[in-house]
Amino acid sequence: MFSIFKRRSVQAALAASGLVGGAVFYSDFIKRPAPSHFNPQFTPFTKSLAPPPSRETLLKNVEDISKFDVLIIGGGATGTGVAVDASTRGLNVCLLEKTDFASETSSKSTKMAHGGVRYLEKAVFQLSKAQLDLVIEALNERANMLRTAPHLCTVLPIMIPVYKWWQVPYFFVGCKIYDWVAGSKNLRASTIFSKETTVAIAPMLDDSNLKASCVYHDGSFNDTRMNTTLAVTAIDNGATVLNYMEVKKLLKSKDNKLEGVLAIDRETGKEYQIKATSVVNATGPFSDKILEMDADPQGEPPKTAQFPRMVVPSAGVHVVLPEYYCPPNIGILDPSTSDNRVMFFLPWQGKVIAGTTDKPLSSVPTNPTPSEDDIQLILKELQKYLVFPVDREDVLSAWCGIRPLVRDPSTVPPGTDPTTGETQGLVRSHFIFKSDTGLLTISGGKWTTYREMAEETVNELIKDHDFGKALKPCQTKKLILVGGENYYKNYSARLIHEYHIPLRLAKHLSHNYGSRAPLILELYSKTDFNKLPVTLADKEVFAPSSDASSDKSVSYASFDEPFTVAELKYSIKYEYTRTPTDFLARRTRLAFLDARQALQAVAGVTHVMKEEFGWDDATTDKLAQEARDYIGGMGVSSDRFDVKQFEVK
């Protein structure tokens, strides 16, 4: 009797959930007005545009400007976000990044603009307003990302396979609460799929005990493209933004107040003294490095390594797999892994991202690499859901990023090991810390909330400093980022019509460059060499041609990935690409999508860049080897790389 009652209760719950879901789906989706996209016939189509200031011009700014209003250390998501916010308010901004934009944590995310569905469960069961506030903040900022960078951010359905009947209403109600909390910012209504529909959508799933699936919606985006876009947007608004500029020392007055920094151009070795009214530490997991310099009376870095006091670091690993590991337009969420985490399996850039792990660290490494244990853990979790064997050889790439939780450093005694479980005062969101010297440190948070973090940071700067000028209010909620102007949903179709290029290339350019894609295709159309994939740029072959009689002509089938010489030249001219690694790992995502293909491309990319920059052989060899070393740490066994065949000709 009990089993019958229980089954009927579950069926009733499912029916009620279905009715609620159907009603909300109708009101939220069917009745929602269709978005107004640009009419391609009347939308400006930019085929030429003056490039932004050269690196040399930006370096001259550093020498000529006696004092900046704001100096930002760090060129990741937060730093470039602050640069955009401050420059659009009318402040004179300088940003310095030690290596390249998004070279660390900001390039190694799960690629989700998400509302924090993980925090929602805690908010409900712990009755935690703080957790609920995190969800509301993230949902608001998710909507802002989708609006301000429409070419880089898209809506992605997430499927939760359910293998126990009682979990169906549990997960569905949770998804509906997520919709309700989002309110007008909700992307699409959550819904339930039957077992049959679930398997039809995701035939790779093991359906032996499958009952149904729940689907909610979040955002997906390209993190390094977003980071580069923010840097270029800041420059477009008057900021001086420089990669490969390392801060070696903080400059202080006699009364121990910050006046600026001593920085070195890592390309030339030249030092610059840069003065500023205010200094922002936006170095993410490396925040403590700058705080240690700030604590020194001379602004020097410490001579011995210290435990981080503000950042509580943990390492998160992701792997990339072939596209058949996940449906092409819907992600999969494992809500409870063997170690009580959540794990995502997401379609991204034609591949599948799986992750992430969570391993506490006592220090913050530079460019960490994934361990084999972490890779195997992810594959083991994935195997629980799939009908076919998960093969280690299918791992195309893997990466390890540092996830910074933060705390008030003034509450942490020096020498406290962050792995000892001392979590008192730990902040689950971002945290702004003001030093007595005037240094403002912003750390923590996540990609989705970068804009709000930047707004709060600039608000604090304006509160604490007299910049001697009238300033605008925050502009970034409505500011369309570079490439988002005049972009519309079917932009790739216009690129195909205008330039007669393959669909895959058109989609790649429109989804990563938006309305600036025509600038790349103008370069593409200029010469046959510019049409080559970068993997073949150092070979004696011709560009794609209709002349089938040419035995050296490359067919479009040779484009394993849609990255061309034209895109490389554009990134050098418009996006401050300085090394082969910049292009292969951050301007494009080839190293993250397929490490083997990226290694094959090193020679071609280096060949083109040598011609563009006029490098000597020693510089060329050094930068090519740096790229190989970087790619070699991306989770693919070294014995599978034949490095010699990829050396620069």
Swiss-Prot record:
Reaction(s) the record says it catalyses: a quinone + sn-glycerol 3-phosphate = dihydroxyacetone phosphate + a quinol
Keywords assigned by UniProt, alphabetized: FAD, Flavoprotein, Mitochondrion, Oxidoreductase, Transit peptide
Cellular compartments annotated: Mitochondrion
One annotated GO molecular function: glycerol-3-phosphate dehydrogenase (quinone) activity
InterPro entries (UniProt xref): DAO_C, DAO_C_sf, FAD-dep_OxRdtase, FAD/NAD-bd_sf, G3P_DH_FAD-dep
Pathway where it operates: Polyol metabolism; glycerol degradation via glycerol kinase pathway; glycerone phosphate from sn-glycerol 3-phosphate (anaerobic route): step 1/1
EC category name: oxidoreductase
Biological processes per GO annotation: glycerol catabolic process; glycerol-3-phosphate metabolic process; glycerol-3-phosphate shuttle
Cofactor: FAD
Main subcellular localisation: mitochondrion
Binding site for FAD: 69-97
Superkingdom in the source lineage: Eukaryota
UniProt keyword Flavoprotein, yes or no: yes
PROSITE patterns, per the entry: FAD_G3PDH_1, FAD_G3PDH_2
Enzyme Commission designation: 1.1.5.3
GO cellular component, one term: mitochondrion
Family, as annotated: Belongs to the FAD-dependent glycerol-3-phosphate dehydrogenase family.
Protein name from the UniProt record: Glycerol-3-phosphate dehydrogenase, mitochondrial
Organism field: Schizosaccharomyces pombe (strain 972 / ATCC 24843)
